[in-house]
Each structure stands twice: as structure tokens, then as C-alpha cells.
Amino acid sequence: DAGNIYGRLTNPTQGVLEQRIAALEGGIAGLAVASGAAALTYAFENITRAGDHIVAAKTIYGGTYNLLAHTLPAYGVTTTFVDPSDLFNFERAIRENTKAIFIETLGNPNSNIIDMDAVAAIAHKYRIPLIVDNTFGTPYLIRPIEHGADIVVHSATKFIGGHGSSLGGVIVD
């Protein structure tokens, strides 16, 4: 055990949080970050580079939409937003440079539910990782990794944190 070197890099309580959220999700490891927006940003930036492409459900949280539609394009990453009510829209939107498919377990704000297993099958057919925001679903209701997700993100400010009194985000793989 290396001990607590510098709190910004890691600390014992952060490590416990990461391990427990990863265990709840059925993942290998977790990374706690400052916010849900940071979790999504880190997940996308880890997978994409300038010239890459993302396919995303169009029924997603507004902040995530803004990240994908306005922020990432400034870095050369584009996104095609698809109507998730027709699952073949995901496959039709895939390009040679597509690096991720993104959905939410429960669409925010409409609470629509996407057939995650089917979207995962499409993603994996093309060897593309499926990133799932499980903020509203929580591992209490659904564990996306068990349904084919490769990366799960949370805004821990919502249900994981309890009452919105703390700010945080988590990435699980």
C-alpha cells in the first residue's frame, strides 16, 4: 500500500468509493471524478481523438448533448444523434471512424428505455465500445455491464450521492 501521497491524485476514501461503485456495477475498476460531466468527458476523451465520431441516442441529458454537439466538435470529434426508438438507426449511423456508441439507461428527461442488449450487440458487431450513463438507472435497478456495456458513467450527484448535496462522478469499466 503506497499510502496517501497527494489528495488530488488519490486518497483512501476515494479508493474505497471507486471499488464499491465498480463492485455494484459488476465492473473491474472505477474512477471517481469531480462531476458527472467530468466522468462523461473523461470517458469520451479517452476513446476519441480529432477526426473521430460518436453515435448517441438523441434522448439524452441536455448537458451531455451540449458536450457532444458543441464542446467535442471544437476538438474535432463529431457526433451523430439518432432516434433510439428504431435500433437500426444506431447501425446506420456508424462510420469507419466511429469510436463509441452512447446511451442512457433511463433517458433524461423523458425516462425512455433503450434495448441495451440490442445496442450492445450492434456496437460489438463493429468492435465499438458502448458507453452507458446509469445515473438514473443506478446499479440497484440495472447493471449495464451485464447487458453489454463496456463503460458505465454516473453523475454521483444524483442517486449515488443520495440527495444532491455532494458533487461527483464515477466511471466504471
Where are the regions a protein language model picked out?
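A glycine-/small-polar-enriched, mobile loop at the entrance of the PLP active site in fold-type I
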Residues: 1-23, 28
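Conserved PLP-enzyme active-site core in the AAT-like
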Residues: 29-173
